[in-house]
């Protein structure tokens, strides 16, 4: 009698095990299918980005968008556009923004430029490695300049797991709105060069 009840009990658990196995297989199949689909979309996005960058980088520079054009500035139409802007650098507002590049850890050095009409455009003056001299001692440049470079869209909200901390002068993203508010600058372009 024990043999019959043991046999019946193991058969009752088999459908449950099969159902659980099927559910797990379906879950993993769906997850991997979703991840694969996401990778294909991401590849398409990256290839489109590379095409946009390559077509814009080597183009002759155009005048950077002025205030009336700022509402139309968008990542898909303006980012990496070769631009030029004229004005006076405001070195007293130069800010270090943490950067990690293929060259190692360091800082981007951002300085606002004031156009003749009063508009402000932040200029990324380049990368300075951590072990280099204090970037805040960079020579104060005076006079009118023409800057040529690539238009980049502001990077809001800090970096992954790190929020900008203006009170302690810790910047993790090139957030032109936050940089401008911290320095009480008005009429600031929503991009940097």
State what each model feature region is.
Residues 2-76, 80-193:
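Surface-exposed, charge/polar-rich loops and edge strands
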């Amino acid at each position: 009698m024990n043999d019959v009840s043991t046999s019946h009990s193991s058969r009752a658990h088999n459908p449950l095990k099969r159902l659980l196995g099927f559910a797990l297989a379906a879950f993993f199949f769906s997850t991997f299918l979703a991840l694969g689909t996401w990778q294909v979309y991401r590849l398409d996005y990256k290839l489109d980005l590379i095409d946009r960058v390559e077509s814009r980088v080597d183009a002759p520079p155009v005048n950077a968008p002025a205030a009336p054009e700022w509402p139309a500035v968008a990542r898909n139409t303006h980012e990496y556009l070769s631009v030029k802007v004229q004005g006076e650098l405001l070195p007293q507002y130069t800010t270090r923004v943490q950067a990690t590049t293929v060259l190692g850890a360091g800082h981007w050095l951002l300085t606002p430029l004031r156009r003749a009409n009063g508009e402000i455009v932040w200029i990324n003056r380049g990368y300075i490695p951590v072990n280099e001299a204090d970037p805040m001692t960079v020579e104060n440049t005076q006079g009118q300049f023409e800057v040529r470079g690539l238009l980049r869209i502001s990077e809001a909200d800090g970096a992954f797991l790190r929020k900008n901390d203006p009170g302690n002068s810790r910047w993790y993203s090139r957030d032109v709105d936050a940089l401008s508010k911290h320095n009480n600058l008005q009429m600031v372009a929503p991009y940097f060069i």
